[in-house]
Amino acid sequence: MSPVNEVRVAWPGARQGPAPEAPHWSDVAHWMRPGTLQLVGQPPLSLYIHLPWCLKKCPYCDFNSHEWREPGGAALPEQAYLDALRADLQASLPLIWGRAVHSVFIGGGTPSLFSPEAIDRLLGDVRALVRLDADAEITLEANPGTFEKDRFRAFRQAGVTRLSIGVQSFNDAHLSALGRVHDGAQARAAVEEAARAFDTFNLDIMYALPGQTLADCEADLRTALGFQPPHISIYHLTIEPNTVFAKYPPRVPEDDDAYAMLDRITELTGAAGLARYEVSAYARAGHRSRHNQNYWQFGDYLGIGAGAHSKLSFAH
């Protein structure tokens, strides 16, 4: 039998020698090159809409929000802003062409300053321009300081499916320290009406507030839980740059006291049947915010309106 000799064939242009090592994950320049990463599918898509006006700029707020102070109490330029939002969305359509939107979040500012008729037109424009899922979650942020008895129901009729109420606290002294325009009684009335008008809603609560004790924090939380909300967002007060609080820092609880507050929050929300599913959000079964989850799971979102931004994925 003839001996078998190993034969190596080098095709023209073929690389000789061992295969090169794959670039390290930290080589951002490499991985950002078009075509380097191929997506087998795209994540869910959400829509964020920013309405920038509020009655009063809170001293801790670093969002793109602006007090509406017009001579003679002139009304908000609702129609002009809605025209601009529609144009913004139309200009963005090539970025999301054909993709379905599974959640909408209308934030601010104070979106509840806009009339229910304006919100109705806004959502009509959205439905006319994008593929909105039939069961899409549509959240509107509301301030108890803009609460009127029939207003929340009118937002529901306009197509809003979920209300997020910026309560922050039920304690009048703490609300005053935060620069809020509502008091505890208004907050309670707003929550009661939201529970009547909506199948699901969220309460925003803050802790580690100026002058707040552990007992104060627990009282706020027990009041909130007394309304049996399906969802609560609980935020530690943060002193952000370029805010009034950054320029004039208030006296806030020590870190150990704030940790004790968080431990109590975790205990009380768990006992009330609210499961923590992200850093600041607690929900009953079936009431997690799809919009929040999409953010935390690195989904896609298109932002329209003053100061809004987007995060979008493309196949290549």
Question: What are the language-model segments listed below?
Answer:
Residues W11, W25, W31, W53, ...:
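A residue-identity detector for tryptophan
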Residues M1-Y48, L55:
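Flexible, acidic/Gly-rich N-terminal and inter-domain linker regions that tether
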